[in-house]
Amino acid sequence: MEERCESTESPQGQGRKNTKCGWLRKQGGFVKTWHTRWFVLKGDQLYYFKDEDETKPLGTIFLHGNKVIEHPCNEENPGKFLFDVVPGGERDRMTANHESYLLMASTQNDMEDWVKSIRRVIWGPFGGGIFGQKLEDTVRYEKRYGNRLAPMLVEQCVDFIRQRGLKEEGLFRLPGQANLVKELQDAFDCGEKPSFDSNTDVHTVASLLKLYLRELPEPVVPYAKYEDFLSCATLLSKEEEAGVKELMKQVKSLPVVNYNLLKYICRFLDEVQSYSGVNKMSAQNLATVFGPNILRPKVEDPLTIMEGTVVVQQLMSVMISKHDRLFPKDTEPQSKPQDGPNSNNNDGHKKATMGQLQNKENNNTKESPVRRCSWDKPESPQRSSVDNGSPTALSGSKTNSPRNSIHKLDISRSPPLMVKKNPAFNKGSGIVTNGSFSSSNAEGVEKPQTTPNGSLQARRTSSLKSSGTKMGTHSVQNGTVRMGILNTDTLGNSLNGRSMSWLPNGYVTLRDNKQKEPAGESGQHNRLSTYDNVHQQFSSMSLDDKHSVDSATWSTSSCEISLPENSNSCRSSTTTCPEQDFYVGNFEDPVLDGPPQDDLSHPGDYENKSDRRSVGGRSSRATSSSDNSETFVGNTSSNHSALHSLVSSLKQEMTKQKIEYESRIKSLEQRNLTLETEMLSLHDELDQERKKFTMIEIKMRNAERAKEDAEKRNDMLQKEMEQFFSTFGDLTVEPRRSERGNTIWIQ
């Protein structure tokens, strides 16, 4: 009753290859009678002919937009294997003719083959119909989701079994629930992506995986390679090493998609047999189960199957146990993140399991370079002079605090950052993209204050507002931005022994909870990261000419730094994050700032002042204006030109990006208008078709009524004719009788 037409061209093919052809019975007509027709599945259309040799089809069924429904066999209609091709499918799309077709096959297998073939045509463009689909076609479609070693169905089943079923006794040997396997198969064939949860039976998923491999049109090892692989098994029985080498040669000669799938399956089965003490599935048992699905002859006659069963089992067992030699791992260097002592990313790396490594290799993904943060210890001339002059004055310095350490940003290794707009930013503020930043007005203002003993100290007042990593306040010297870190969730760790207390007036005090270290080491952590294109020089600054960096915010996704338009140094703005608000006022570091130059000769006085600052909850900084002003003025011109050239180039880059994004937005809007116009036209056409359909229904009803009226008139005429003939017959018979009665006999 049914015939496959995949490799030959039928007379109805007109030069195109048919997917499937055979005899089916179709119900049609007003009286719903069954007609036997020759059906040909070609492309996305199903043709039916009166005879196999006919060239002109009686009709065509357009499959796209339809769906197939199987009718279960019942006791009322035994021997009828029915299925419907009805409108619907994805999002209930309507077909061109809005008709449904009831078809009947001769056997259950015949019906299932037709249903699978039709579903493959309907759902193939949407990723469905994968059961019975060619492996290369499935891989070609799924390339849009990334390169993979195996189809997504195989990956999903393997991942689920790896998580929940490796210790299940009788895995792959015990069958799953047939109805659940059928439901999952139908779901995948209809383009759906069903997910497995904790209630899903492991044996059902394992049966689904075996079913997919069994229903491939051509097995993982192609038919042309079947005899070559069997010869390898014969060689293995004689000389194992030579057999393994020959098997490696044959495996490498497989097509790429077949090689990748075989590699994926063998590695997974080796992982399964590693739990053989629990699941009772050794390599030999797994080879018995998977061998016929991986290696099978083209003609499956009983004699060939019996002869090749033992050989296939032996060969499959070798491929599982020696998969490391047969499928060498790709030696691709993968970057491993190296976190510094106070890196922004403090999460430790977890050891990946075998399944995770295999999925990484399957997805062909490499670990993207992560933004690095490292701390180095250059020595500041200013701090060195202070240490040499008064070792006891800075004995309590914190070498590991963010203010005293260098936060180096490896821009070359960081991934590109997306530009984000924040309405909370002031005009002129910008977002750093790959290390670039735009200018804006500074918020913080330096306020010189007088200490109790009469010495001047510069106090920086700013408000740090962020939910993530905070940047401390530092001065800019020679065009270099010094950035410290204040992280709200790792204050205790990042400050390494410096406690933080809040005062009623909003000030912040950093107290020393760590033992003092030698003065020679305390001067090695005083500057922060510098840009490579700006030379770092340390010199004293005067109080009047000093411009400090109030605050800056650093996160793993964006960095925002603002510059004053007419200033000699960089001043950063703050960033607002929606998660939480964190304010810091009058932030100072007495250890980094150091004592006033006038008080270096009296270490004891400086210690007393430090104690008073600690008790009062404040820290201050004082610098000498007479010694630092001349040096700073000398470096102002070079800093000014370097920073403004950088700002101008970054502004140009942001302008280009803005133009590009605007053009993209306009093109998308234009495309949206075009699609809306097309949608309106399609809606109009749909309404017209519906009106036509309604008119045709009305005409059909009128025709049926006219037919009924004609039949009634015919009946009436028939009765009238019968009455007329009966009456006419009576009239002709009576005169004859009277004539006979009046006859005169003459003798």
From Swiss-Prot:
A Gene Ontology term for the protein's cellular component: cytoplasm
Listed GO biological process terms: angiogenesis; cell differentiation; negative regulation of Rac protein signal transduction; negative regulation of ruffle assembly; Rac protein signal transduction; wound healing, spreading of epidermal cells
Start and end residues of each stretch annotated as Disordered: 1-20, 327-475, 581-639
Ranges of biased composition (kind: Low complexity): 616-629
UniProt-annotated site: Arginine finger, residues: R173
Protein name: Rho GTPase-activating protein 24
Location of Phosphothreonine modifications: T451
Biased composition (Polar residues): 334-346, 355-367, 381-404, 431-475, 630-639
Keywords of the record: Angiogenesis, Cell junction, Cell projection, Coiled coil, Cytoplasm, Cytoskeleton, Developmental protein, Differentiation, GTPase activation, Phosphoprotein
One Pfam family matching this protein: PH
Role of this protein: Rho GTPase-activating protein involved in cell polarity, cell morphology and cytoskeletal organization. Acts as a GTPase activator for the Rac-type GTPase by converting it to an inactive GDP-bound state. Controls actin remodeling by inactivating Rac downstream of Rho leading to suppress leading edge protrusion and promotes cell retraction to achieve cellular polarity. Able to suppress RAC1 and CDC42 activity in vitro. Overexpression induces cell rounding with partial or complete disruption of actin stress fibers and formation of membrane ruffles, lamellipodia, and filopodia.
